[in-house]
């Protein structure tokens, strides 16, 4: 191994030790047939939505709402569901900066999010995105606007 390679490996090891990132355990927060895997995420982590056991007559949308401030939310993404078509499926979501969509900096994602199940009476789910960034994803969260 050349000294340059060893130096690079030592640098990577140092960065890993400084970050001390460990993903939180999955909690599977549930509302009816809908589940998300955690109550808290860092930027860069994927949010895992699991839907299982939809009734044949259950039709609607899962709406992910991002915080605008302490009292107002805005739709980030909607995912349609139709139990007569498919009673179970999974979906991964990873909030990403986008100049086109107006998501310019990490401040657009940090805070308490809600998941609303339109067309049903199931209670909302809530989760938090912190200002921490998944190690290695820092460049993906530099301001774009």
Regions found by a protein language model. Name each.
Residues 1-145:
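Extracytoplasmic/secretory-pathway segments with low complexity and glycosylation-like composition
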């Amino acid at each position: 191994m050349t000294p340059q390679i060893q130096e690079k490996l030592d640098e990577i090891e140092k960065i890993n030790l400084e970050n001390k990132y460990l993903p939180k355990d999955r909690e599977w927060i549930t509302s009816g047939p809908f589940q998300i895997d955690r109550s808290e995420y860092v930027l860069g982590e994927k949010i895992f939505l699991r839907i299982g056991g939809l009734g044949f007559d259950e039709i609607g949308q899962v709406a992910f709402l991002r915080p605008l401030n302490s009292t107002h939310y805005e739709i980030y993404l909607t995912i349609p569901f139709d139990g007569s078509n498919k009673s179970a499926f999974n979906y991964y979501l990873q909030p990403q900066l986008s100049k086109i969509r107006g998501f310019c900096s990490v401040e657009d994602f940090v805070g308490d999010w809600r998941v609303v199940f339109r067309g049903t009476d199931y209670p909302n789910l809530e989760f938090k995105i912190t200002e921490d960034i998944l190690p290695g994803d820092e460049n993906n969260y530099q301001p774009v606007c």
